[in-house]
Amino acid sequence: MGPQHLSPMQLLCLLGAISSLPWAEALLCYEATSSLFRAVGLHRWQWFLLRSMVCKLNEGCEETLVFIEAGTRKGILGFKGCSPASSYPPQVSYLVSPPGLSIASYSRVCRTYLCNNLTNMNAILHLKARTPKTLKSSSHSCPTCVGEHSKSCLPNFVSSESCPRDATKCYSSTVKFQAGFLNTTFLLMGCAREHTSVFAHFHHIGSIRVTEVINIVEKALFTGAGTPCRSPSWGILLGLLFAFKG
C-alpha cells in the first residue's frame, strides 16, 4: 500500500485540531509573592501584578493566598506562578477555624493567558463575613504575635491578649512557607483550642510547602517590659529560628 497523501482541507483540519490542544503552547502566568505582617488591612490590601513568566508545557497558572489571624495580629502570605497541578476552580476555606487562632486560604489553578490575576482579599472577606463572631472571652490570656522574629515579633513587640472561651490553650510555633520566590519564616503565637500542630494536616497549601516546629516557651517570658531575650528559653527559641531559616 502506497503512502497516503492528505488533501489541503484535511491538512487544515489536522493543523486546527493540533493548535487547539491545551498542551500545544506554553502559558504566560503572573509571578508574585506576598509576605505581610504589619498594618494588615483586608480591605486595603492589594496584590500588584508586576511580573509574568512563561510556564513549562502542561503547566497552569496558580494563585494561593493564606490569611492568618491570632487575636489582633494578622498575616498575609501568597504565591503566584506556574503549577503542574490539574486545573481547579477557586477554593476558599478555613484550614483552622475560629475561635482563637485561625487560618484561611484561597487557591486555584487555571489554564488561560494570565488568568491568575487576583489582586484583593474579597474571597477571604466573604468567608469571614459568613463565620459566626466569638463574643465570649475567658479569664485566660496568651502571648500573641504573627510575624518574623527579627521584625514584628521581637520579644518587646509580643503582647498578651485575652482568649475566647473555647480557645484557652497558649500556642507557639515557628512556620516556614516556601514556593517559588516565597521563602518566609515566621512566629505564630496566640490562643488555640489545642496544643497540637495547626499545620499537621497541611504540608502543602496549593504549591506552598509548609514546615512547622512547635515552640516550648514560657508565657512568663512575655509579660511586662522585662528583658526576655536574656532568658535561656528565649535564647533556645532564637537559636531554633536561625537554624530553621538556614
Curated annotation (Swiss-Prot):
Propeptide: 226-246
Membrane topology term: Lipid-anchor; GPI-anchor
InterPro entries in alphabetical order: Fert-Immune_med_protein, LY6_UPA_recep-like, Snake_toxin-like_sf
Domain called UPAR/Ly6: residue spans: 142-223
Record key words, sorted: Cell membrane, Glycoprotein, GPI-anchor, Lipoprotein, Membrane, Repeat, Signal
CDD domains on file: TFP_LU_ECD_LYPD4_rpt1, TFP_LU_ECD_LYPD4_rpt2
Pfam families: UPAR_LY6 (PF00021)
SUPFAM superfamilies xrefs: Snake toxin-like
Lipidation (GPI-anchor amidated alanine): 225
Glycosylation sites recorded in the entry for this protein: 117
Primary subcellular site in the record, as a coarse category: membrane
Extent of the signal sequence: 1-26
Cellular localisation: Cell membrane
UniProt key word Membrane: yes
One cellular component (GO) term of this entry: side of membrane
Protein name as catalogued: Ly6/PLAUR domain-containing protein 4
Species in which this protein is naturally found: Bos taurus
